[in-house]
């Protein structure tokens, strides 16, 4: 998905006003890991996902998660913020219903919304709540990051909004995983075209 218009969706972080904001202190890390964080922050900053923030009320630490290929994924520990945020009750589909709906189709195309979360902008009034600390400063995401309590519900909401008339007919959506299904070969390419034009 290209950047999604904020008139369609933006991610909000409502917080319980009785819960006090938490500022996590910078955690110690191996020097080689801090360099990986610096590299990832620079990359995300340069593509416009991040901005520098001063005096944030909420502040979380970065956590590096090793990947199978030897690289690491930079995540943010939003546990404190997530505790203060009420659950978004937008429904996620039942997996068994999705499986039943694709049964019997001749062709299935599986798609993953690559960097899909990052196509959804943060609501301006909530942007600084997702602030995080590094050895080089504090930043916040201008786009919806992984790790926020209701990010999956927000993504499901936008996918349902964009594809509502195709779901359970030609397509199935579970958060950022999408399946285009067709009963015959001739219908599959036009169905895929319709999907990609919409997304």
Please identify what each model-predicted range represents.
Residues 1-199:
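Retroelement reverse transcriptase polymerase core
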């Amino acid at each position: 998905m290209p950047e999604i218009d904020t008139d369609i969706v933006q991610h909000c972080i409502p917080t319980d006003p009785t819960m006090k904001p938490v500022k996590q202190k910078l955690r110690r890390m191996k020097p080689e890991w801090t360099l990986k964080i610096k590299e990832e922050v620079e990359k995300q900053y340069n593509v416009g996902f991040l901005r520098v923030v001063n005096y944030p009320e909420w502040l979380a630490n970065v956590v590096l998660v090793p990947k199978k290929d030897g690289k690491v994924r930079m995540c943010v520990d939003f546990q404190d913020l997530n505790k203060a945020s009420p659950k978004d009750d937008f429904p996620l589909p039942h997996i068994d219903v999705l499986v039943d709906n694709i049964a019997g189709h001749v062709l299935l195309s599986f798609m993953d919304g690559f960097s899909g979360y990052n196509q959804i902008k943060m609501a301006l009034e909530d942007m600084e709540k997702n602030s995080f600390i590094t050895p080089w400063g504090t930043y916040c995401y201008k786009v919806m990051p992984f790790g926020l309590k209701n990010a999956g519900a927000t993504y499901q909401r936008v996918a349902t909004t964009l594809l509502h008339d195709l779901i359970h007919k030609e397509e199935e959506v579970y958060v950022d995983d999408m399946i285009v299904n067709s009963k015959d070969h001739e219908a599959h390419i036009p169905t895929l075209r319709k999907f990609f034009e919409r997304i």
